Amino acid sequence: MKKTILFLLAFISVSVSAADFTVTSATIKNGSTLTNKHVFNGFGCTGENVSPALKWENAPAGTKSFAVTIYDPDAPTGSGWWHWTVVNIPANVTELKEGASSKALPKGAVEGRTDFGKPGFGGACPPQGDKPHKYIITVYALKTDKLDVNGEASGALVGYNIGFATLAKASITATFSRPAAK
């Protein structure tokens, strides 16, 4: 009888454990192809360059801030391509509205420089005719309320700082490609 009760208590404690940290988007579904709304406008691309809506939940205990990155590991650079980095998002914020980049970010949030050379969001823009590229959108729960980076920080520098402060992360991935030039 005691063994049965202990087993049931152990099972119940596992079942009641915290839910996983997750991210979703009303504008980009996991595994989908990006629409023109989230494609860069420049560099040979003619998209609307609008940052996606993101919502996250079940951050772990001890979360003091959040960071968001969008990264293309398939860019033919040898080091991928950073499309968006946002840090110092307050712990009480659990979403970014579509188009938040540069105009509607939470107070204190900082956008780093994309690999297009400017701070803010830079949408997808793979080379024409290249295979579909993956765009990994990640929200990080951080154990610090502020990372010491500014708007001139590269994606690599932001990623380095995020790496030392991460409690948990959640990602969704989308793809995009452009037809070969005629």
Task: Label each PLM-derived region with a short phrase.
Residues 18-182:
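N-terminus-centered regions that define maturation/targeting leaders and the start
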